[in-house]
Amino acid sequence: MLRYSPMSSLQYPSSLLQSMILPMRFRLLLSVVSCLYALCLSVLGAPPLEELEQAAFENASRAVQDSVVQVETFGGAELVNRQFAAAGPSTGSIVSSDGWIITSSFPFRNQPASINVILANGERKPAKLIARDYSRELALLKIEVDTPLTPLLASDRKAWQVGQWALALGKTFGPEQASCSVGILSAMGRVWNKAIQTDAKVSPQNYGGPLIDLNGRAMGILTPINPGIVSEGEVEQWYDSGIGFAIPFQDILDRLPRLQAGEDIYSGRVGFRWKGNDEYSEAVVLQGITPGSPAAKAGIETGDKILAGGPAPDQLVAIRNHSDLKHVLGPVDAGGTIVFEIERSAERRQLQCELVRELPTYREPFLGVLIDPTADPKTPVIRGVIPESPAMKAGLQVGEIIESIDKQSINQERTLDVRLGNLNYRDSVPIVLK
């Protein structure tokens, strides 16, 4: 411990002095090494770090100049969802040498009368809108070419690291030179596992342009997709928010054959809803199943607990909460399949669903009985029967107990309401009474 002397000076123990001297020696050595390194750089004429970074940015941007085009639209609706539709030029990215161009669907919300693509050499080509990916806010264009174009090359997704440099390119000011903003890859698996995130400055004119690495390879295509998007008219609220999103380029290439065939792509819907509102702390316990939905056809029931999900039985990932479920469902398109591992009555089973674009219109099944609210839910007692209802036509009587419906017993977990909720409107099912 420190000792106080009458001279108001501090005397340190020898062990403490030794521990202080070592860091001081280390700092002195580090300073000497730094000075020598700086001296060597000045003698050898090596460029400073800022110049090396600038050269890397310029080389990466230059590598994709011919693969980035300007997209012009003309005509179409002036208002979309009570907002003025975009009319200025936007950006496209060449994905094949024979004239296929991926871009954002942002300029096409107003259904333009004509589309032009301006290549890097200034040549203007008429373009056709072939298909759209509504889930990712993308569109595929086709132009006719006389000479092969230079397509983007895909970045190695396995090598990505959060924090690495990322460059956002767009043909904002003219077709000859792409504008470039510098940032980092700030997050992956965003927008329910459909996008990557960057802090590079992104504007509506950059949408459709590539997000590239320092090797000039495409990491993704910039798009106005956002986590809370409900309709196309809401994309502007994220402009200049400090972050931007890009759809991974390899994901686009995987779907390219479908788009080239003229097939529009939509988000897949499964047809169940779950209990609770906490995204991160509550397990996924199903509260309802839409009749006729993929979930209903797969045999998923109200009360099931979802434990895992994935594209195949050997590719399941754990689903611990609502957020995990959304990340599993997010990238699955309509027509795609997903396997769920569920827990029901302490037993585990795997069920496969084929997701659809739209769920069938739900009409709540109507039996026509009033249940005694004081009765045990496991033994629902009929308190009243509504005239002309299915229950009256079937001969149900006041005082009877409903034991099962559609060959499914009534119990604490599977109450009468739950069993009815799993039926379709106008289903004809057997009811066992006591």
Regions found by a protein language model. Name each.
Residues 44-93, 97-100, 104, 112-114, ...:
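N-terminal activation segment of mature serine protease catalytic domains
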Residues 46-51, 76-77, 96-178, 191-197, ...:
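Conserved active-site neighborhood of the chymotrypsin/trypsin-like protease fold
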Residues 48-61, 149, 214, 218-278, ...:
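C-terminal cap/linker of serine protease catalytic domains
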Residues 67, 81, 85, 144-152, ...:
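Active-site region of chymotrypsin-like
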Residues 68-72, 101-105, 159-172, 184, ...:
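Active-site-proximal beta-strands of protease catalytic cores
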Residues 101-103, 215, 219, 295-322, ...:
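Conserved PDZ fold ligand-binding element
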Residues 107-110, 238, 308-341, 404-432:
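PDZ domains, with a preference for the canonical peptide-binding region formed by the helix
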Residues 207-210, 280, 290-306, 328, ...:
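PDZ/PDZ-like domain micro-motif
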